Regions:
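A Rossmann-like FAD-binding core segment of flavoenzymes
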Residues: 21, 57-59, 100-109, 117, ...
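Beta1-alpha1 glycine-rich phosphate/pyrophosphate-binding loop at the start
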Residues: 25-101, 187-231, 437, 441-446
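Short glycine-rich anion-binding loops that position phosphate/pyrophosphate groups of nucleotides
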Residues: 41, 135-138, 291-293
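Short glycine-enriched, charge-decorated loop/helix-capping segments at active-site entrances
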Residues: 75-82, 147-148, 155, 302
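FAD-site-proximal beta/loop scaffold in flavoenzymes
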Residues: 150-177, 281-344, 354
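C-terminal auxiliary extensions adjacent to catalytic cores
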Residues: 383-447
């Protein structure tokens, strides 16, 4: 919902404009359904509710101070030189669903006892029902020296995890011809856990195209113990890593970057390592920052002890405040935080919200479906699809075989089809992930 602290100076003019606009909003407003966050989850929820015949009179509001909406899965394409930044962003005002009231307000806390959200602009917004979709914070400042390195174009340090840094990734890949390249993934929960290695595989592929691959020593340094959380795909990616001569530095979490000395410092998380510091010299460094719940969410009454909005993993309903639901990256749903996951969460949330409004039992169930279209090079992609428990749930296995094998068809889905689908169907409430444009049955059939 907001700019990363490390990049906030660039956002100041927009904030002044929003404060001016907000003065025309009454100090107190009320809507039947209030959605906090106009990212993929919030927009899609608003659109599906607005399209729903079960809601009756539509009175939906969405709160988000952003001026631009980003198709974040497209940032890997931008960093790989396959798309321009303009291709993967739109003015937020252009994609708010018709009939939905947009308030460009910055929420700073939730007041669930009074069915209210409070904003920095002094406006209190009350609701009958709340959908919390605040997203998460990409914490660039969580790595010492990283913000400064990212602001120096000569540092050879870059990241696909912000619209303000992603274009530098492709420039760095093109300019790099020889030396030590390190790609990092932090420990803990992040958005799209496959993205840190997607950009690595695409860089490797580009360097191979340019004939310089043999002059570059590549390391994948991850805080995780394996290449991927789902065993089936992790095994395939580990085989690919070894086949392509990529060094694996597992359970090593990046904690500091010295751009001048070209040194990255990691904390060894392995059992018995006692958190020892490990330093690695680099000539090229791609960093994925640590990520966490927004502080204002974590400190609120609707957050659990881990800081995420505390909801039932099957119904998406809050565990304490029954008129609150949460989806997307800011929720406690224990799955991969991806756009594909949101495509499966929203219909469940909508059906359960409508059931609650009608005084009925909440029967819709989210099974944890998520997908990671994992680029492994030009003209190839591993389409990882799975549900809770790391159980594969593959859409195209009957056609192409097991999806752990990279496929050119999947590559063009990611590169050409999915961006079009996102802008023309997904955020308009007409896309349902593996069900495509057919709305899924969200209530499990009784055997």
């Amino acid at each position: 919902m907001a700019a990363s602290p490390a990049l906030r100076p660039l956002a100041q003019p927009a904030r002044r404009l929003l404060r001016t606009y907000a003065t025309s909003i009454p100090a107190k407003v009320h809507h039947q359904v209030v959605i906090v966050g106009a990212g993929t989850a919030g927009l899609t929820a608003a659109a599906q509710l607005q399209r729903s015949a079960g809601l009756g009179k539509k009175d939906i509001a969405i709160l988000d101070p952003a001026q631009t909406h980003h198709y974040q899965p497209g940032w890997t394409l931008v960093g790989s030189g396959l798309r321009s930044l303009d291709d993967v962003q739109r003015p937020l005002s252009h994609i708010i669903p018709d009939g939905v009231k947009h308030y460009p307000l910055r929420v700073f806390t939730f007041d669930p006892e009074n069915n209210a959200v409070k904003t920095s602009e002094g406006v209190d917004v009350t609701y009958d029902y709340l959908i919390a979709a605040p997203g998460l914070e990409t914490n660039f400042a969580g790595v010492s020296g990283l913000p400064e390195a990212l602001q120096d174009p000569a540092s050879q340090v870059s990241s696909i995890y912000s619209d303000r840094t992603v274009e530098q990734v492709w420039r760095n890949i093109q300019a790099f011809k020889k030396g030590r390249a390190i790609f990092t993934q932090p420990a803990g929960i992040i958005k799209c856990a496959g993205a840190p290695q997607k950009i690595m595989w695409m860089a490797l592929s580009q360097w191979k195209r340019e004939g310089v691959r043999d002059d570059i020593d590549i390391t994948f340094a991850t805080g995780a113990p394996a290449m991927f959380a789902v065993p089936k795909y992790s095994q395939a990616l580990e085989a690919l890593r070894k086949e392509r001569s990529v060094h694996g530095l597992f359970q090593h979490n990046l904690i500091a970057v010295d751009a001048k000395k070209k040194v990255a410092t990691f904390k060894n998380l392995a059992e018995g390592a006692k958190g020892a510091s490990v330093q690695k010299e680099f000539d090229f460094l791609h960093v994925v920052p640590p990520q966490k719940p927004w502080d204002w969410v974590a400190k609120s009454k609707i957050a659990g002890s881990d800081g995420w909005v505390d909801v039932d993993k099957s119904t998406t309903q809050h565990t304490k405040y029954k008129n609150i639901f949460s989806i997307g990256d800011g929720s406690s749903l224990p799955n991969s935080k991806t756009a594909a996951a949101i495509s499966a969460q929203v219909p469940v949330m909508v059906d359960n919200l409508l059931a609650l409004m009608a005084g009925k039992e909440l029967k819709a169930v989210y099974d944890g479906y998520a997908s990671c279209p994992l680029l492994t090079g030009h003209n190839e992609l591993m389409l990882c699809e799975f549900k809770y428990g790391g159980v594969p749930q593959e859409t195209f296995a009957d056609i192409f075989g097991g999806q752990e094998s990279p496929n050119a068809a999947y590559y063009y889905l990611k590169k050409n089809i999915f961006p079009w689908v996102y802008w023309n169907l997904f955020v308009k409430g007409a896309w349902y992930g593996p069900n495509h444009i057919i709305r899924p049955q969200t209530t499990p059939s009784q055997a």
